Regions:
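A preference for well-ordered globular domain cores
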Residues: 2-116
Length: 116
């Protein structure tokens, strides 16, 4: 009877330890995912003509559809900045794609580490 009791306690302790490890791993995954997203949000900023802009799909769409070659936009510091639309559009597209590619690669690494 004593051996059975010790055996049950050992199994329960092992299961609890495994459960704690799984919870920690899930928490680490969510934390790492959030930190990565915050990093990428910072990486989405691009300097242009003494201004700093956050590149978003909305900004890219705006630049792609605006009819004039010169446009004035408010930067992240709330300053009006003159932009050469096509030049800035190309810069934004390249910068956005680089940031999204980096995010995708790093996110896959986090997912892979979670499954190990």
């Amino acid at each position: 009877m004593t051996y059975l009791f010790l055996w049950l306690i050992t199994i329960m302790t092992t299961e609890i330890t495994q459960l704690v490890a799984q919870i920690k791993q899930a928490t680490d995954y969510q934390t790492n995912k959030r930190i990565l997203k915050e990093k990428i949000q910072t990486d989405l900023h691009v300097p242009y003509n003494n201004g700093l802009f956050k590149v978003t799909p909305e900004l890219i769409a705006f630049l792609a559809t605006w009819p004039a070659d010169t446009v004035y936009l408010e930067d992240t510091y709330e300053n009006p900045i003159e932009l050469q639309r096509l030049e800035f559009l190309e810069l934004c597209q390249q910068h956005y794609q680089q940031a999204m590619n980096a995010w995708h690669i790093q996110y896959d690494e986090i997912k892979r580490a979670r499954k190990v």
